[in-house]
Amino acid sequence: MDIRNEFLQFFQNKGHAVYPSMPLVPNDATLLFTNAGMVQFKDIFTGIVPRPSIPRAASSQLCMRAGGKHNDLENVGYTARHHTLFEMLGNFSFGDYFKEEAILFAWEFVTKNLGFKPKDLYISVHEKDDEAVKLWEKFVPVDRIKKMGDKDNFWQMGDSGPCGPCSEIYIDQGEKHFKGSEDYFGGEGDRFLEIWNLVFMQYERSNDGVLSPLPKPSIDTGMGLERVQALLEHKLNNFDSSLFAPLMEEISELTSLDYASEFQPSFRVVADHARAVAFLLAQGVHFNKEGRGYVLRRILRRALRHGYLMGLKEAFLYKVVGVVCEQFANTHAYLKESKEMVVKECFEEEEHFLETLESGMELFNLSLKHLNENKIFDGKIAFKLYDTFGFPLDLTNDMLRSHGACADMQGFELCMQEQVKRSKASWKGKQNNADFSAILNAYAPNVFVGYETTECSAKVLGFFDSDFKEITDANPNQEVWVLLEKTPFYAEGGGAIGDRGALFKDNGEVAIVLDTKNFFGLNFSLLEIKKALKKGDQVIAQVSDERFEIAKHHSATHLLQSALREVLGSHVSQAGSLVESKRLRFDFSHAKALNDEELEKVEDLVNAQIFKHLNSQVEHMPLNQAKDKGALALFSEKYAENVRVVSFKEASIELCGGIHVENTGLIGGFRIVKESGVSSGVRRIEAVCGKAFYQLAKEENKELKNAKTLLKNNDVIAGINKLKESVKNSQKAPVSMDLPVEKIHGVNLVVGVVEQGDIKEMIDRLKSKHERLLAMVFKKENERITLACGVKNAPIKANVWANEVAQILGGKGGGRGDFASAGGKDIENLQAALNLAKNTALKALEG
């Protein structure tokens, strides 16, 4: 049975609109990942956005529970039901039907569509929800309905907001396999398995904890697809179902082991984590040192450790990830489209960790011999595994689990505090809804007229201070936010900065508009007050001329993404952008730096579309129709039922709410000024067009004239070659080795930069001069940084050291344990590379 399709078709027949799975990275600062089906409807439930035209919804939502409040990572592989990535089937009512219909729908689907026997089904309800008990008694004997407390059967979104009792459907898997003391309905055993949770959102909890009935109660339900699949196949473990069979077969082939062997938990960990890695990479999450990228890294490294237990000492996970991409190609087309990029990025991350995995395992195994009688693992060693060898703490604890031990958390935290604190993203976020509730209740969304005009007459609805508390009037030299009845100012969004401009009254300027932002559907402009204004004043709102330059750069960004996909492949997707009046910045998914030929092709393609003078076309259509037309959409964006589509004939088509030029010819010209790395798997292009393009051409022409003068040669290339020959001749003389040498614990440490000379030869000379050495020498040449490093009788491998430092330069190193070299084109990161080189060496020496 195709459970997903069966579920969605069932609820579509019951009048529900079917919604696609939203991205795993939600447009919600309070969440690390999308962890439930209701996440994409959160703003509807809280009243921030209006109810959709069809107030019933159904979805099959991909969810991630690793990191953050909901973290199942440590349990995966050791239990029958835990996953990092899973699909949640759900039906929702936004003030339409309530308990009676929700219970009826659930019972019908479970017994008729899924075919579960009514005699095997049990129900839990909240202890005070007598209404639900009466409704369930129509289908289930009262002795199979159990009342439970708030802990088990009361759901709330946060400390305040919508909440209500819930009711769960359980299935009895039979006493044949479950005979423990806790295997009774309501016990902690696995015999009675929850399959569906129905949440009855009927209350609003105030900040002081008081519950008030909601005027329009709602429904939110969730049922795990993997769990249902296993039950239908009479499997006692989710991983034993056909959903995971292709992955188990691949792992068995790679390891030459049987799934039913002692390594079964490791099979399950690798299978689960391969799914998570595939979907996260395909949806634009990349390996990183913080936030979501670090969770992704932890998942991969945990999988590699379990592969290591099964004898896999080389990269392997990328092969299992490839199977995931093929398995889900029909239901999630983007996995197939991005398979090459996903597999490549996974392989490179594996290679990086495998360089330190074996050394880290040696330290771990050695330290196990010194466990104290309480089986507490030294926190300092746990920190060294984390800091030097890249072992996340949960990975170390996972390894300790099989030895009945755990890490000294206090000791680990002390080491962490002593280290220089890296900036960390706080994914908990702020509950801003309460700050705006009064404004949302008082004002309807203001009208945006900026697509049609850059100037309009408008009434001042209100002024607000920096905390968005309403104030009655605005006086000279104040900075305040204003809400206009209608506004021509475009609010920051889609990477484009907010409009600036001015307000006029009685033919005089009364305020400068510094910025424009949208909060919960309201467009606010930040003002610098020149003359006193009060609520109710009628003003003329005028957008500044820089709007046109922003529009040029915004349209150029669309053409750029299209060109990148044509040159590099369809795996390219937007990872971030900034659109200003004098430049654009575009971040995109791609595993390696673009070479000169690729950059030239991209630039030529964009300019070719500019010179074609293509007219822009703006259409409004249903989201599914837009996607069918091939419109590009952001994974991180949450779209409405109807969307705005901007296209430039065959050159580009995207979902976009921004301001654009009417014709590509108005962009003028396009130049890429820089290409660099942002993080693993994410590249950045910076470019200019319009007036900024012309200004750059003027400056470069001026520099060219100056170069001719300095070289005393109208042929600049010939003049440079002559100068290079002169420099080359001067370098034939021996180069002095004026590099700083520090002696630490008997080892000579050399980290520095030279302007000329053969750095490989310098390393050789240093090695011959010193008995114990750690040396890394950098040199700028041909718009790149090259480095060479040598190790002699010191506790670090040259190839590991060089490769780690090279990554910050956008490159990769290679070599042996005693000598290695590397290079990269991110010249601006030289100082950071020097710092990393020295700190890595110091850690190795101090260890």
UniProtKB/Swiss-Prot annotation:
Report which residue ranges the record marks as coiled coil: none
Q: Which Gene Ontology BP terms does the record give?
A: alanyl-tRNA aminoacylation; negative regulation of DNA-templated transcription
Q: Which UniProt keywords apply?
A: Aminoacyl-tRNA synthetase, ATP-binding, Cytoplasm, Ligase, Metal-binding, Nucleotide-binding, Protein biosynthesis, RNA-binding, tRNA-binding, Zinc
Q: Which GO terms describe its cellular component?
A: cytosol
Annotated EC: 6.1.1.7
Any keyword Aminoacyl-tRNA synthetase? Answer: yes
Cofactor: bound how, per the entry note?
A: Binds 1 zinc ion per subunit.
For this UniProt entry, the molecular function terms from Gene Ontology, in alphabetical order, are: alanine-tRNA ligase activity; aminoacyl-tRNA deacylase activity; ATP binding; tRNA binding; zinc ion binding
Q: Where along this sequence does the record place binding of Zn(2+)?
A: H554, H558, C656, H660
Which compartments is it annotated to reside in?
Answer: Cytoplasm
Q: Which reaction does it catalyse?
A: tRNA(Ala) + L-alanine + ATP = L-alanyl-tRNA(Ala) + AMP + diphosphate
Q: Which InterPro entries match?
A: aa-tRNA-synth_II/BPL/LPL (IPR045864), Ala-tRNA-lgiase_IIc (IPR002318), Ala-tRNA-ligase_IIc_anticod-bd (IPR018162), Ala-tRNA-synth_IIc_core (IPR018165), Ala-tRNA-synth_IIc_N (IPR018164), Ala-tRNA_ligase (IPR050058), Ala_tRNA_ligase_euk/bac (IPR023033), DHHA1_dom (IPR003156)
Q: Which cofactors, by name?
A: Zn(2+)
Q: Give the superkingdom in one word.
A: Bacteria
- Principal place of residence: cytoplasm
Q: What is known of its domains?
A: Consists of three domains; the N-terminal catalytic domain, the editing domain and the C-terminal C-Ala domain. The editing domain removes incorrectly charged amino acids, while the C-Ala domain, along with tRNA(Ala), serves as a bridge to cooperatively bring together the editing and aminoacylation centers thus stimulating deacylation of misacylated tRNAs.
Provide the function of this protein: Catalyzes the attachment of alanine to tRNA(Ala) in a two-step reaction: alanine is first activated by ATP to form Ala-AMP and then transferred to the acceptor end of tRNA(Ala). Also edits incorrectly charged Ser-tRNA(Ala) and Gly-tRNA(Ala) via its editing domain.
Q: Indicate the family of this protein.
A: Belongs to the class-II aminoacyl-tRNA synthetase family.
What is the protein's name according to its record?
Alanine--tRNA ligase
Question: Which gene underlies this protein?
Answer: alaS
